[in-house]
């Protein structure tokens, strides 16, 4: 999911830089653990509450960070590779990998197709806007990146019910690891009906 390395910053959109390339772990002092809540809800199928844990350890020179992740639990747990030299927060890639596998499960469409749609939209169709969030009782400044990767997909007829899916990334340097949360939402066919599907990951805090 991460754009290819070796390109200058100007080759990437503002959304790509905010989501994939920013040094989101700059405010983290390893060893540290980031804790996130995860909630799935909606009328499409049963929901659940779970958690996500990311553990960070210092590199040999003391800098940040090598990381290990636990994304959800039990039969929902996502097998994740360790990351040897993380700069951006791995929780973003983990969430997107979970999301892509869910899109495949719900539609039987190829995972690589959904990856490509997300990459293309973050590059050329995402919105980045200033935002403020609440974190541990305080208001913090940040940015919200939002996009709908399937809205103008010529193949959307194959999964029309899910084609309006919206992604929102809540980013703030005032939050450990730089990512306050990620939300996805698929609205129902009528405005007065509850959403078809929502998923929300929110940071709970950091511990040494």
Report each predicted region and the residues it spans.
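Surface-exposed, glycine/proline- and aromatic-rich loop segments on solvent-exposed faces
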Residues: 77-102
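Acidic, serine/threonine-rich low-complexity disordered tracts
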Residues: 2-83, 107-208
């Amino acid at each position: 999911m991460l754009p290819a390395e070796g390109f200058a910053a100007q080759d990437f959109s503002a959304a790509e830089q905010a989501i994939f390339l920013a040094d989101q772990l700059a405010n983290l002092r390893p060893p540290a653990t980031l804790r996130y809540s995860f909630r799935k809800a909606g009328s499409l199928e049963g929901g659940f509450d779970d958690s996500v844990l990311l553990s960070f350890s210092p590199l040999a020179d003391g800098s940040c960070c090598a990381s290990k992740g636990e994304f959800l639990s039990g039969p929902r747990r996502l097998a994740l590779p360790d990351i040897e030299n993380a700069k951006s927060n791995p929780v973003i890639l983990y969430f997107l990998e979970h999301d892509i596998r869910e899109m495949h499960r719900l539609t039987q469409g190829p995972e690589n197709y959904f990856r490509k749609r997300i990459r293309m939209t973050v590059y050329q169709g995402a919105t980045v806007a200033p935002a403020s969030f609440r974190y541990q009782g305080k208001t913090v400044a940040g940015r919200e990146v939002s996009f709908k990767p399937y809205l103008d997909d010529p193949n959307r007829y194959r999964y029309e019910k899910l084609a309006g899916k919206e992604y929102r990334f809540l980013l703030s340097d005032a939050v450990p690891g730089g990512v306050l949360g990620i939300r996805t939402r698929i609205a129902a066919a009528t405005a007065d009906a509850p959403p078809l599907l929502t998923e929300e990951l929110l940071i709970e805090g950091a511990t040494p």
